[in-house]
Regions:
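GST-like domain detector, emphasizing the conserved glutathione-binding G-site
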Residues: 1-36, 154-162, 166-179
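GST-like fold's C-terminal all-alpha helical module
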Residues: 8-123
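Mixed-charge, Lys/Arg-rich low-complexity intrinsically disordered regions
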Residues: 130-162
Length: 179
């Protein structure tokens, strides 16, 4: 699971995003680009992505070929016979491409095992969508409690314990921490 999550959230995601912005006109408005620049700490340049679209499509194809090979043993889902977080992590990348960048869909369709797996995930469904505002979403998150029992790790190298204030940020391209 963890290794596949690293692949889906970094390598596959970056290939998918590059294809989306490299093959789709007008998807990113000025506010979105500024938000991404703040997140990544570097300029967001859709024109460069468009210029690199052919190479980016090859990168996506290579990742999908690898996924296709993984599924070639006829397993139903990525980790075996049951769905899991790995399937969700991989699927959202393909859904993102299909929803926004039809040019990328053609590459997905060439991978027969991926297409069959994708159909099995689609058959599960997406649940019921509900629009939430930022404040409402934050209130729900604040009111949520964990099902995991609190514990202190005696080997925690920084002496952190439940209730301590921490900053959380991405460990890849994201640069804006959340306190």
């Amino acid at each position: 699971g963890w290794g596949m999550g690293l692949w889906t959230d970094r390598v596959l995601f970056q290939a998918a995003v590059a294809v989306i912005f490299g093959t789709t006109d007008g998807f990113a408005d000025e506010a979105f680009m500024k938000d991404r620049e703040k997140l990544m700490g570097r300029p967001f340049n859709a024109d460069k992505m468009k210029a690199g679209a052919p190479m980016l499509m090859e990168q996506l194809r290579a990742q999908l070929d690898w996924l296709n090979e993984q599924l070639s043993d006829k397993r139903a889902f990525l980790m075996g016979n049951e769905t899991g977080i790995t399937d969700v992590n991989a699927y959202y990348n393909l859904a993102f491409i299909r929803w926004i960048a039809p040019g990328g869909s053609a590459v997905i369709d060439t991978c027969t095992h991926v297409a069959a797996w994708e159909k099995r995930i689609q058959d599960i469904g997406h649940g019921d969508r509900k629009e939430l505002g930022r404040e409402e979403a934050r209130d729900i998150a604040k009111a949520t409690t964990s099902t995991q029992a609190q514990a202190t790790d005696p080997g925690e190298p920084n002496g952190l314990k439940p209730g301590d204030q921490v900053h959380v940020m991405a460990d890849d391209y994201g640069r804006d921490p959340i306190a």
